[in-house]
């Protein structure tokens, strides 16, 4: 018999996965550069997604009452992508910029996910891969 606790993707997703960053061009491992990330099924990410959907639905209702459609600029879409990636970051190691080590703070996470879209893409892709968060 299988115990459902062994299939709890929400808990496993919040525990995290150590993502080994890859070079954006040649896909070689960037030695020492790792980001611990939450999975898409984690409670934290699910709560973020619910909040985002509720906000967008509310905005859409208000605009609909004014006979307007909900649209987004490229900057708004990028900001949403950055926020969605940032909520998945738990911690990191080996991340530096300009010769200085970057501590894993909310400000630095937002900065890195904004400036280095390839890192943001890797975080999102690894977060979506359920195998990375398979409960033991």
Each language-model region and where it sits:
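Short, surface-exposed, charged amphipathic helix/loop patches that serve as local interaction elements
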Residues: 29-136
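Short acidic, Pro/Gly- and aromatic-enriched capping/linker segments at domain boundaries
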Residues: 11-24
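Short, intrinsically disordered N-terminal pre-domain segments
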Residues: 1-13
């Amino acid at each position: 018999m299988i115990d459902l606790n062994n299939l709890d993707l929400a808990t496993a997703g919040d525990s995290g996965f150590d993502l080994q960053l890859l070079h954006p061009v040649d896909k070689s491992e960037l030695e020492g550069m790792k980001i611990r990330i939450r999975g898409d099924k984690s409670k934290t990410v699910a709560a973020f997604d619910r909040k985002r959907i509720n906000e967008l639905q509310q905005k859409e209702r208000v605009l609909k009452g004014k006979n307007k459609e909900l649209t987004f600029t490229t900057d708004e879409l990028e900001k949403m992508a950055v926020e969605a990636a940032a909520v998945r970051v738990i911690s990191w190691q080996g991340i530096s910029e300009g010769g200085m080590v970057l501590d894993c703070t909310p400000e630095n996470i937002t900065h890195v996910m904004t400036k280095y879209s390839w890192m943001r893409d890797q975080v999102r892709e690894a977060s979506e891969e359920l195998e990375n968060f398979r409960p033991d």
